[in-house]
Design a protein with these regions (language model features):
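Class I S-adenosyl-L-methionine
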Residues: 1-18, 23-124, 210, 216-218, ...
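A contiguous loop/helix-start segment that scaffolds small-molecule binding in enzyme catalytic cores
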Residues: 8, 97, 165-233
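Structural signal for conserved beta-strand scaffold positions within catalytic alpha/beta enzyme cores
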Residues: 37, 63-66, 127, 147, ...
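Short gly/pro/ser/thr-enriched loop/turn and capping motifs at secondary-structure boundaries
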Residues: 42-44, 70, 132-135, 204-206
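Short beta->alpha linker loops
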Residues: 46, 102, 129-132, 159, ...
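Short secondary-structure transition/capping segments
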Residues: 85-91, 108-117, 144-149, 172-186, ...
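Class I SAM-dependent methyltransferase SAM-binding "motif I" and its flanking Rossmann-like core
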Residues: 106-167, 219
């Protein structure tokens, strides 16, 4: 009899509000025996907390995944390999594993690194889409991301602001908190502060909304989950 190998699922939990999780995500988590989720050095597991708001997870095996915050590619890769190894132990035992991902699993998500490693080892992987932080932020602000069917939309990390602001169309600058002073300076140089808005921790209890960044103090911390929307100038 052929041995069953588990499937590795990348499950999107949305930006913060559990009500934004899809029915597909909820059902997959209900049926998956092992739930993997990133854990911070201080023990926080935000994606798991969000999922618990929509799914009863008691009785599940919770697998914390530790990812290095270092910018050193070698350090990052070592963390990805170690996380993939931990997941594969359950897959080899015939258990499905669902990895929780903030926002959508296809957008700046750690799942992709583990997916590449595990697929190379013959494991089956499946991605379940979800609501992105920038779509939720646009809805929170009550504004369209694009002004029309023909307008381009550029999505980039906040650290790339200086390079993308000159491009045509609207822009989304994700995870902008760490480089916020530099990002705001680039936007000021481009004359786009008055056409920009920011939502921090969208859908979470500590959510903050800034419809206009003209008077935002660059020294004020916005946190890691800061999403900036820039209308075309």
């Amino acid at each position: 009899m052929e041995k069953r190998i588990g499937t590795f699922y990348g499950v999107s939990v949305g930006p913060g509000d559990p009500e934004l999780m899809t029915l597909q995500a909820v059902r997959r988590l209900e049926n998956c025996p092992v739930i993997a989720a990133p854990q911070t050095p201080k023990g926080g597991m935000l994606a798991l907390d969000i999922a618990k708001g929509a799914v009863e997870l008691s009785g599940k095996t919770i697998l914390p995944l530790h990812f290095a915050m270092s910018l050193d590619p070698a350090v990052q890769k070592a963390a990805h390999i170690e996380a993939a190894r931990a997941v594969k132990e359950y897959l080899d035992a015939g258990q499905d594993v669902a990895m929780l991902n903030l926002g959508d699993v296809s957008v700046y998500a750690t799942f992709g690194y583990l997916q590449e490693i595990l697929e190379a080892e013959g494991c089956k992987t499946v991605m379940l889409p979800g609501v992105t932080s920038f779509c939720a932020a646009a809805a929170r602000l009550g504004q369209s991301l694009t002004g029309g069917m023909e307008q381009p939309l550029t999505i980039a990390p906040g650290r790339c602001a200086a390079e993308v602001l000159a491009a045509p169309g609207a822009k989304v600058l994700m995870k902008s908190g760490r480089q916020l002073p530099e990002t705001l300076a680039a936007m000021a140089d481009a004359g786009l502060l008055s056409r920009s808005a920011m939502v921090c921790n969208c859908g979470l209890p500590n959510e903050e909304v800034w419809p206009d960044l003209t008077d935002y103090d660059p020294a004020r911390s916005a946190g890691y989950f800061a999403t900036i929307l820039v209308k075309e100038g």
